[in-house]
């Protein structure tokens, strides 16, 4: 590697900044990192830098510009067992990338990549090896002739290593990867890029030039694209000359904090301890970003990934001897490390720390219950913990085998690991058979268990009641045979009348009943066509195979149905009033309100909101009947049915049609006629992200209650202001005018008081050489009055004057105000009021700023006021004397 110069980026932040700036100068638009929760429904998390641009590459979305560059936060958990073990595996990482959408291609991509890594990052050509697709002669030629790389440093590889595709069909193309050689002294004979101790791949250039059809044939794309990715953590390891990514400034401060808390020295620790520290250092970064992006710990999907990461950290914390809550302390370090580049972390800091604490405490309680069982086994005098009991600890209490072994060893007893493995294998066999109940494990996921169940038949469109059979019971994340009174359960049925949360609509509420059984259902979620009923057993015993009846709360269903139909009418009205291109970006259909997110480059005006409301209410009054039927998706789209962008639909779809008003693909519940909505009211409209607006609205009973509350408020205002409703506006305008006049009178009185307080100061100004100096405390004046006083005194004393005033406007609030005013002569000599006031206010734990001739500041510590003014007096006397002597 070339020797580092003072301009060579060395910190992780500098590496990121230089990458983005480099490509920005090459006319790339800098795109902020997208959320870890992708718009793409085919993936659970953002796993690559190109994922936010996938719709652009597929031609489904307009390109943000011809060229783009980004630093994208990503999470991958497919190799979680390697995290902390290898030098470079992570769950959370940042991918630096530059992209071309039909603009430049191989030559520019390769030349710029080389310029970046050699000129900007200072890497030596002797440390770089490149790989290319063995049939990509164009890239080989560019590397040889244009870049000048020695042929032996160009390694040709097959399709497995150097040909990228988005799937079995679609855009694809060869790629060229840059590797860093940590041991160039070994030469370029017989290079093995799989040698992880010697080589690390750090920059991948993908040349998307083909489209692969279902038969595997490649045809040229109309537009050739570039997609590149550079791992920030890997480049930091290279430039900071570290043994692994974990010891870079991106992660190591977290590891240091964990070492401090656990009183363990990282460098002198054994490998097992280092692995635990590195796992914690990695996982905490993933966790804070997941929570900040809106993920909530649960047993499903993204929520399970979050929960799994937190529990792994708690487990490895236990291995480090950390028996008390510690994760929030590490999260605080992680947030401080990354908040400059990800401001949302700072904004969501309290929420992040709170969620981590709650989840850690919850899991520690589970661990404590497991420890009690373990203590009983130890105190029983047994010399060996059986495999069955070890598996029970693991399976029921989430107790890692390693922790069981550690505690057993401390008490001089053994653990039947082979028996444990046998129980684990038996569980896997039961899962494969899918005919017996299995337990959820700490490292397992409810998402996987759903595959054990057949599709739930939903028969709730036409009836709110249904006969059903209990097919699965979950109790505290474990599949069980029975549940009793007072226990919270998750129930799977063979068929149900409960609507499962999907398409933005909340799940139904109600009851599941049998002879002596009552389960109150408070939520239903649909996953992979399996309906999960959440509730509590109010009476009786719930058993597998039990025959039951489902009974949906009809009032709640009616409210949700009304709000769902209202959402369809709202979208149609927005298309009419705002723009035909308005499309749904998200929605919530709840019992008490609806929320609709849609694309719009600017806010909706008050006039447009009024027109939308009026149009929706006119459709309600017209009493349109809804026609709902199933048909082929192609037919529905040909008829003009609206489909949500990015949503996946079956070949047969359900179409909800309000004739001449709205037609959408939708699986939700709806009213029979629009008049059932009663009325419609928009209660808010706001922007939630770039190009996306959000409307919240009410219909039916909720809308009537809203109007009733407003009417009650108007009545109260009429009583207070002694006016009838028609006079309210005039009365408020009159009061506002009176208030303005009174405030003017008050300000005039304040100015007179201020003048009385400061008028005598001009005659008592101190002479310091050629200059007049006033430094004084004036209490009881607000900011405006203090400013007027300083400017007035400066005007009276002339160009060679300095006025510094500090005071306490209101002693009850315990705040300080400062103002500094310089005459023109001092400004010409280079004096700056803004700089001086910063120095003064800092003494009192404050801050401020301003122009060279005038500045103001606020501060908190009123006890330091005299110290601040004395500092100013000494500082200015020295400076003014020096100016007078010249």
Curated annotation (Swiss-Prot):
GO terms for biological process: alanyl-tRNA aminoacylation. Pfam families: DHHA1, tRNA-synt_2c, tRNA_SAD. Keywords: Aminoacyl-tRNA synthetase, ATP-binding, Cytoplasm, Ligase, Metal-binding, Nucleotide-binding, Protein biosynthesis, RNA-binding, tRNA-binding, Zinc. It is found in: Cytoplasm. Disulfide bonds: none annotated. InterPro entries: aa-tRNA-synth_II/BPL/LPL, Ala-tRNA-lgiase_IIc, Ala-tRNA-ligase_IIc_anticod-bd, Ala-tRNA-synth_IIc_core, Ala-tRNA-synth_IIc_N, Ala-tRNA_ligase, Ala_tRNA_ligase_euk/bac, DHHA1_dom. Zn(2+) binds at residues 564, 568, 666, 670. Its EC number is 6.1.1.7. The keyword Metal-binding applies. Its cofactor is Zn(2+). It catalyses: tRNA(Ala) + L-alanine + ATP = L-alanyl-tRNA(Ala) + AMP + diphosphate. Binds 1 zinc ion per subunit. SMART domains: tRNA_SAD. One of its GO terms (molecular function) is ATP binding. Coiled coil: none annotated. One of its GO terms (cellular component) is cytosol. The keyword Cytoplasm applies. PANTHER family: ALANINE--TRNA LIGASE, CYTOPLASMIC (PTHR11777:SF9), ALANYL-TRNA SYNTHETASE (PTHR11777). Consists of three domains; the N-terminal catalytic domain, the editing domain and the C-terminal C-Ala domain. The editing domain removes incorrectly charged amino acids, while the C-Ala domain, along with tRNA(Ala), serves as a bridge to cooperatively bring together the editing and aminoacylation centers thus stimulating deacylation of misacylated tRNAs. Belongs to the class-II aminoacyl-tRNA synthetase family. Catalyzes the attachment of alanine to tRNA(Ala) in a two-step reaction: alanine is first activated by ATP to form Ala-AMP and then transferred to the acceptor end of tRNA(Ala). Also edits incorrectly charged Ser-tRNA(Ala) and Gly-tRNA(Ala) via its editing domain. This is Alanine--tRNA ligase. It comes from Prochlorococcus marinus subsp. pastoris (strain CCMP1986 / NIES-2087 / MED4). The gene is alaS.
């Amino acid at each position: 590697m070339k020797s580092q110069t003072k301009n060579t980026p060395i910190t992780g932040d500098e590496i990121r900044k230089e990458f983005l700036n480099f490509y920005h100068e090459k006319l790339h638009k800098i795109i902020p990192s997208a959320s870890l929760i992708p718009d793409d429904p085919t993936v659970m998390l953002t796993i690559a830098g190109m994922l936010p641009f996938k719709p652009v590459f597929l031609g489904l979305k307009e390109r943000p510009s011809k060229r783009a560059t980004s630093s994208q936060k990503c999470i991958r958990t497919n190799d979680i067992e390697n995290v902390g073990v290898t030098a470079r595996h992570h769950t959370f990482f940042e991918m630096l990338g530059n992209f071309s959408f039909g603009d430049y291609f191989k030559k520019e991509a390769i030349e710029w990549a080389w310029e970046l890594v050699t000129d900007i990052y200072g890497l030596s050509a002797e440390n770089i090896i490149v790989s290319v697709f063995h049939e990509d002669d164009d890239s080989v030629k560019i590397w040889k002739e244009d870049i000048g790389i020695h042929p032996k440093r160009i390694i040709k590889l097959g399709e497995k290593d150097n040909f990228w595709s988005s799937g079995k069909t679609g855009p694809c193309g060869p790629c060229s990867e840059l590797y860093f050689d940590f041991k160039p002294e070994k030469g370029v004979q017989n290079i093995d890029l799989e040698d992880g101790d010697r080589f690390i791949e750090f920059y991948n250039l993908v040349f998307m030039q083909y489209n692969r059809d279902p038969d595997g044939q490649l045809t040229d794309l109309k537009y050739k694209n570039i997609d590149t990715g550079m791992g920030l953590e890997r480049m930091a390891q290279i430039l900071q000359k570290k043994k692994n990514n974990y010891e870079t400034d991106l992660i190591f401060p977290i590891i240091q904090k964990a070492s401090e808390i656990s009183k363990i020295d990282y460098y002198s620790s054994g490998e097992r301890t280092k692995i635990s520290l590195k796992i914690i250092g990695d996982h905490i970064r993933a966790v804070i970003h997941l929570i900040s992006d809106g993920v909530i710990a649960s047993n499903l999907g993204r929520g399970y990934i979050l929960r799994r990461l937190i529990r792994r950290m708690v487990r490895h914390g236990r291995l480090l001897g950390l028996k008390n809550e510690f994760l929030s302390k590490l999260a605080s370090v992680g947030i401080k490390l990354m908040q400059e580049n990800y401001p949302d972390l700072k904004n969501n800091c309290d929420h992040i720390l709170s969620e981590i604490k709650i989840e850690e405490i919850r899991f520690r309680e589970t661990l404590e219950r497991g420890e009690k069982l373990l203590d009983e086994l130890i105190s029983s005098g047994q010399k060996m913990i059986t495999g069955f009991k070890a598996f029970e600890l693991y399976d029921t209490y989430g107790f890692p085998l390693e922790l069981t072994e550690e505690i057993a060893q401390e008490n001089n007893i053994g653990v039947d690991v082979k028996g444990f493995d046998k129980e684990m294998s038996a569980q896997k066999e039961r899962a494969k058979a899918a005919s017996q109940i299995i337990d959820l494990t700490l490292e397992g996921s409810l998402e996987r268990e759903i595959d054990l169940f057949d599709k739930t038949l939903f028969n709730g469109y036409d009836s709110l009641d249904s006969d059903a059979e209990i097919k699965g019971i979950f109790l505290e994340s474990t599949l069980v045979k029975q549940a009793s009174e007072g226990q919270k359960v998750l129930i799977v049925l063979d068929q149900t009348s409960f609507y499962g949360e999907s398409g933005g609509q909340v799940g139904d509420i109600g009851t599941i009943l049998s002879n002596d059984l009552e389960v109150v259902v408070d939520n239903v979620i649909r996953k992979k066509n399996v309906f999960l009923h959440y509730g509590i057993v109010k009476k009786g015993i719930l058993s597998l195979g039990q025959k039951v009846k489902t009974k949906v709360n009809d009032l709640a269903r009616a409210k949700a149905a009304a709000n769902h139909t209202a959402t369809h009418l709202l979208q149609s009205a927005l298309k009419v009033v705002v723009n035909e291109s308005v499309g749904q970006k998200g929605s919530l259909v709840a019992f008490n309100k609806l929320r609709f997110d849609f694309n719009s480059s600017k806010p909706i005006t008050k006039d447009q909101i009024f027109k939308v409301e009026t149009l929706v209410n006119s459709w309600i009054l017209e009493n349109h009947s809804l026609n709902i039927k199933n048909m082929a998706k192609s037919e529905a789209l040909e008829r003009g049915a609206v489909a949500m962008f990015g949503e996946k639909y079956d070949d047969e779809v359900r179409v909800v049609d309000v004739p001449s008003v709205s037609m959408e693909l939708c699986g939700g519940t709806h009213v029979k006629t629009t008049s059932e909505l009663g009325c419609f009211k928009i209660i808010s409209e706001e922007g939630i992200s770039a190009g996306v607006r959000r409307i919240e609205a009410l219909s039916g009973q909720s809308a009537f209650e809203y109007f009733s509350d407003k009417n009650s408020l108007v009545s109260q205002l009429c009583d207070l202001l002694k006016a009838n409703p028609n006079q309210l506006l005039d009365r408020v305008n009159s009061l506002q005018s009176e208030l303005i006049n009174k405030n003017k009178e008050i300000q005039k009185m304040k100015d007179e008081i201020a003048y009385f307080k400061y008028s005598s100061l001009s005659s008592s100004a101190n002479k310091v050489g050629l200059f007049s100096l006033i430094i004084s405390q004036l209490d009881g004046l607000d900011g405006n009055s203090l400013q007027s006083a300083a400017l007035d005194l400066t005007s009276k004393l002339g160009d060679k004057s300095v006025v510094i005033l500090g005071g306490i406007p209101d002693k009850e609030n315990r705040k300080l105000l400062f103002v500094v005013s310089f005459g023109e002569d001092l400004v010409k000599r280079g004096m700056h009021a803004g700089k001086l006031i910063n120095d003064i206010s800092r003494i009192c734990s404050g801050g401020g700023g301003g122009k060279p001739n005038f500045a103001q500041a606020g501060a908190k510590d009123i006890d330091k006021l005299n110290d601040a003014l004395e500092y100013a007096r000494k500082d200015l006397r020295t400076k003014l004397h020096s100016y007078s002597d010249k």
